[in-house]
Amino acid sequence: MTRKITSGKVSRRMLLAGSAAGAAAALSSFPAPAIAQAEPFRLGLLTVKTGPLAQGGIQMEQGVLTYLKETNYMIGGRKVEFTSADTGGNPAGTKTKAQELVERDKVDVILGPLAAFELYAISDYIREQKMPTLSLAAADNLTQRLPNPYLLRASATSSQAMQPMGHYAATEMKLKRIVTLSEDFAFGYEQMGGFQAAFQQDGGCIVNKLWPPLSTPDYTPYVAQIGDCDGVCQGFAGSNPLRFMKAYASAGFKFPVVTGETGGDDALLKSYGEEAIGLVGCCPYTIDLEIEANQRFINGMLKNFETIPGQYAALLYVNCQVVDAALKATGGEAIDKDKFMAALKAVNLTDTPRGPLKFDHLNNVIGNFYIRRIGTEGAKYGLKLWNKTIKTYENVSQFWTWPEQEFLAHPVYSRDYPPLTKC
């Protein structure tokens, strides 16, 4: 399903109008001419509304709408026409919807998609079309060994949050032997690969790697395979972390559990029970970040949708800030795609819900990543559970602590790389 949205209502084709307000950016190399654009700025979103990834996909749309409502439906001094497309969470559907956004709806920018396998499916197409795309999808190689010049990522690669998590698990939690579990697709492979590489670098060992399918109704058979270890790393996405943590607790295991950006997402806190207490995760966004930009974002989500935001909403809101800053830098001009991409890459923001960010030369974000522990202390907004930040890793790049060329000399993280070694 594809829909165009304005002021919370749905119609076939509507313009979003209002006054401008946007994010600050350091873009001195792009002097901004006077903005005089009669045409609307067409913003397209590829997201997921059905299936196990739908919870995050719905929050993606809410994050965009929260920003548009805050700015009175203006970006870069131009009225916005916003089209939201449901990919169905599969590669074929994603490509079809991308083609519709580009060829039928004539969008100026695509936000999304959600899943790494979706982004891999459309990478060649967006390159051919020279379509500026700000993707939440964390497909590592598209800002590494196979960089796409029309892709910008303001969220994280799949492995980017898991690398500091691996370091923290080894050096501060003092874990030695871990079993990893994540979905049997690209995001899962790349998450667990990043965790394994960093964990092993700091003296840890991976005992086993388990790969349940994305649509696994019951994780009990996989929990039963955990075996001899002193910790577990889960990288499930969407609503799957809820089922896994319940199965884990029901089995009576007491080993510490660590996770990445999706397994401890703030939006899951209202659905988690006692089984999640003590879960330690690493994320590029955290609800407890006490800065004005984050409070403004949270208040907007509560006002507009009466929901607690997580990283899916927050990072799409940040993507809108990036687009707004770049469009202001070009004076509202986005017809020249290469010029607009150059402006996007040059964005350097300090006032975002996730904290400061900038981009590396391969178009991936450099920003803060937060280690959080779920507990009851400090809970707000009617929640019983809360993510409390216990450590901040600043200016984290996709290459972690490795020199870029050394990192890129290795294969992309996969189901089999890094390989298991004897513990």
Language model regions located:
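C-terminal segment of N-terminal export signals and the immediately downstream linker at the start
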Residues: 30-48
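Extracytoplasmic "Venus flytrap"
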Residues: 44-67, 85-91, 114-115, 181-189, ...
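N-terminal secretory signal peptides
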Residues: 1-10, 17-29, 35
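Beta-alpha junction/loop-to-helix N-cap segments that form part of ligand/metal-binding clefts
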Residues: 55-62, 74-145, 211-220, 242
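Extracellular/periplasmic Venus flytrap/periplasmic-binding protein
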Residues: 96, 140-142, 149-251, 287-296
